[in-house]
Curated annotation (Swiss-Prot):
Positions in coiled-coil regions: none
Subunit structure: NDH is composed of at least 16 different subunits, 5 of which are encoded in the nucleus.
Role: NDH shuttles electrons from NAD(P)H:plastoquinone, via FMN and iron-sulfur (Fe-S) centers, to quinones in the photosynthetic chain and possibly in a chloroplast respiratory chain. The immediate electron acceptor for the enzyme in this species is believed to be plastoquinone. Couples the redox reaction to proton translocation, and thus conserves the redox energy in a proton gradient.
Organism in which the protein naturally occurs: Fagopyrum esculentum subsp. ancestrale
Cited InterPro entries: NADH_UbQ_OxRdtase_chlpt_su5_C (IPR002128), NADHpl_OxRdtase_5_subgr (IPR018393), ND/Mrp_TM (IPR001750), NU5C-like (IPR003945), Proton_antipo_N (IPR001516)
EC code(s) of this entry: 7.1.1.-
Designated name of the protein: NAD(P)H-quinone oxidoreductase subunit 5, chloroplastic
Major subcellular location class: plastid
Amino acid sequence: MEHIYQYTWIIPFIPLTVPLLIGAGLIIFPTTTKNLRRMWAFPSILLLSLVMLFSTKLSIQQINSHYIYQSVWSWTINNDFSLEFGYLVDPLTSIMSMLITTVGILVLIYSDNYMVHDQGYLRFFAYLSFFNTSMLGLVTSSNFIQIYIFWELVGMCSYLLIGFWFTRPIAANACQKAFVTNRVGDFGLLLGILGLYWLTGSFEFRDLFEIFNTLIYNNEVHFLVGTVCTFLLFAGAVAKSAQFPLHVWLPDAMEGPTPISALIHAATMVAAGIFLVARLFPLLIVTPFILNLIALVGIITLFLGATLASCSKDIKRGLAYSTMSQLGYMMLALGMGSYRAALFHLITHAYSKALLFLGSGCVIHSMEAIVGYSPDKSQNMVFMGGLKKHVPITKTAFLLGTLSLSGIPPLACFWSKDEIINDTWLYSPIFAIISWATVGFTAFYMFRIYLLTFEGHLNVHFQNYNGKKSSSVYSISLWGHEGLKPINKNLSLFTLLPIKNNESFYKNPHGDIKKTIQSFLITNNCDNKKIVPYPHESGNTMLFPLLVLIIFTGVIGFIGIPFDQENMDFDILSSWLTPSVNLLHLKLNNKNSFDWSEFLTNATLSVSIAYSGIVLASFLYKPIYSYSSLQNFALINLFAKRHPKRFFSDKIKNVIYDWAHHRGYIDAFYTRYIIRSVRGLSQFINFFDRRVIDGIPNGLGVTSFFVGEGLKYVGGGRISSYLFLYLLYASIFLLIYYFDFTNININFTDQ
């Protein structure tokens, strides 16, 4: 068995072959490499498949033997300091390796078709392979030095991938925003690593955990110092996993290609923060204040992400806020001490969210054939609707992902999310109520996305191809029904969608549909003009990953279902994670026991809340298919708008939408109070440096220059002039000497 583990070090370097070969090919044979660019998808998929097979073998060994293997090479700098590099194989390593490789392979297959017409095809696959290398190196690291190196490489890859289309200003700004925001967390991570090394004298995880715990238990180090160090480490995870308050980069990161959104923001990069907290869990157990802080950050993030996702027009940004919310569930579980539940939800969410992102990519891909390449249109749900008739496979895949994320049994996320919610009752009833309410929010915003995208009519047919609105039907309210009035662009704090003159929020929602539907649109797609009456299903290489992810979404949740209550390792996941600790169960002296009646009671309530969210979304966003239905709806609306409570509810809706549209005003707060302050300080420092610090030597230099220039013209080359000046200076010197000598004699005489 050990001979398998000893080759684990090669795992991160296998995918690295692809970017090296692509770079060498572009240098040596640039024309041939570019002409045969699609050939590079095959080695990318093949090499990552080899890593997946190796990771699968390691996972099977971990489930059967629970063997932890570590290998270290020591690089001695001097007698007092030794730098060590190595790798660690444990259950957490095997789980993350499986996630990275399985999702990575599917994304590579999907990207071959999705990026086929992009000029940066080779660059895209080089970035993807290098990103996989960085993530695999991160999860196999055995010490903080390697963690930090690969942590920064992951951040660099995310910067390159988010800004892949860097010629678009919005994409360039998004990658800079992600980079700077993550630098804040990375600086905290670096300080925490240095602080722990100062306390323990080691970078190796196993030695560091043992020494730190001993110091805390024996009161050999001040508790505040240890708490500050662990808090700084947690700051790195907050930024990388888009937790409050460093979550602001995640929605803007959707400016990258959709496969990047599936890979980075579903299974890998944003999960790196969860991985770091899980890796440091033995360290956090002895600092309960930090665990409580982690739980607090998690509960704020999951609720904030759910509220912000409820009004998003962009399909990818809505899924990004959803990712932020689900990562909050994982962080909450880790803060409560529910290690198993956090990793369980990490697994189930990765496959479900990858399915949703790739499904949204198929939707965007089909919409681009009609609206052209314009993310503002192809990703805007206002232009969508009725796609279930045109992309049925994508619709089915997206629906299953939506049901899973909403917590509907027996799909994957139901099992993991309910386990977290059950544990919140043992930790804090307030947190349990918030997490339960967020289940309803999750079902609401996910079915809102589904209904606006796939149900009803294709809304892009209600406008001309040149973008001019031909009917009021085009202006679709974000609350579900179409509105006559266009959205007011004069945004204010509480009146994003103002209602004036006692108008109803749903007043006169429809015009004459028969006069607005156009039969077809002529677009320029891939340099070939052709008639594209409706969106079309994506190619097989884009649909195949969806089908595989459907299988994962359906069956992956069963690895955490208990089947034998007599045995402690009663399910695959518990056996995989052995030994693992649930602090909540230890407090109740309830070790690894499972109460099916309690689980079913809590599950029934959570599923009921989820169905309530689905019903609410269906009520607000239910499509209207016939003209008679439009007339009936207008008649109902005529009576409803006269009710005085209607105006109050409309104001509440506008306030909620204003909050979501402005991202909770957190970005505005940062811009006004932090970014402007830092920019003003930078401008002052720049002024002081250039005008004062540089002004002193520059002023002396300029003065010397002009004095020299003046003296240069004093002498004309005549000896008589030199003698005159000599005698003049000598006379002045003698006069000064005479008066000084006279004053000295007078003072001496007076004394």
